[in-house]
Amino acid sequence: MENTENSVDSKSIKTSETKILHGSKSMDSGISLEESYKMDYPEMGLCIIINNKNFHENTGMACRSGTDVDAANLRETFMNLKYEVRIKNDLTCKEMLELMSNVSKEDHSKRSSFICVLLSHGEEGIIFGTNGPVNLKKLASFFRGDYCRSLTGKPKLFIIQACRGTELDCGIETDSGAEDDMACQKIPVEADFLYAYSTAPGYFSWRNAKNGSWFIQALCEMLKKHAHRLELMHILTRVNRKVAIEYESFSTDSAFHAKKQIPCIMSMLTKELYF
């Protein structure tokens, strides 16, 4: 269990103090080419990390201590997976929207996928720029199939480390037992997205000032261990278990002490994803 004091990524709460191989999988691997994403384009793709740590005074939002640890951990993890990582720090709402718009207009035709990581304060459906709220759906909409054609049919992953409300999870004791053909297909514009949230809807998301957020720590660890052999949803299930079992908040404020967290994955992916 973590035993250093933890914070939550909510705007309303002050701080309480080996080589990775990639490519399309052959039939010899037991993975059908028709059921898994083509990942042997010349480039794996972009990984955009928006790391919002310091917020305008008039927002009343606290500094997100520990987020730089998350950003560095993510950078190392996705660079090892051969992604082109771009970190953007302390962006306003307008800057976040402009960044997403500009990136969506790039030519992704030689890229296998796209990843965006959002590290900030949040509420349900909302991520915060340094000066206020941005609708998460608006940020992601730039990469819909009808807007970003060069990513159509390719996996688009959004990883969100932020609160989704103000509920606290006290936990409960439990027994210990038991070349593709997309040109001739019509697909939904919202297809091939995955949203990996650090917490369930309505709940706080925890972050440690020294080690970073629980979710990002677990995500990076599981990717480093399993990205070369497990499908993405299997990896994320292991992330869920690690966060749920191994982490518990420690706070001098009894209202925030001994709390739990469970990540939440929402997938519109249409194929299996192997890095």
UniProtKB/Swiss-Prot annotation:
Describe regulators of its activity: Inhibited by BIRC6; following inhibition of BIRC6-caspase binding by DIABLO/SMAC, BIRC6 is subjected to caspase cleavage, leading to an increase in active caspases.
Report the residues modified as N-acetylmethionine: 1
- Entry-annotated residues carrying N6-acetyllysine: 11
The organism's lineage is:
Eukaryota, Metazoa, Chordata, Craniata, Vertebrata
Give the catalytic activity: Strict requirement for an Asp residue at positions P1 and P4. It has a preferred cleavage sequence of Asp-Xaa-Xaa-Asp-|- with a hydrophobic amino-acid residue at P2 and a hydrophilic amino-acid residue at P3, although Val or Ala are also accepted at this position
What is this protein called in UniProt?
A: Caspase-3
Write the record's keywords in alphabetical order, separated by commas: Acetylation, Apoptosis, Cytoplasm, Hydrolase, Phosphoprotein, Protease, S-nitrosylation, Thiol protease, Ubl conjugation, Zymogen
What organism does this protein naturally occur in?
Bos taurus (Bovine)
Q: Which residues form the active site?
A: 121, 163
- The protein's superkingdom reads Eukaryota
Q: Give the Enzyme Commission number.
A: 3.4.22.56
Q: Which residues carry this modification: Phosphoserine?
A: 26
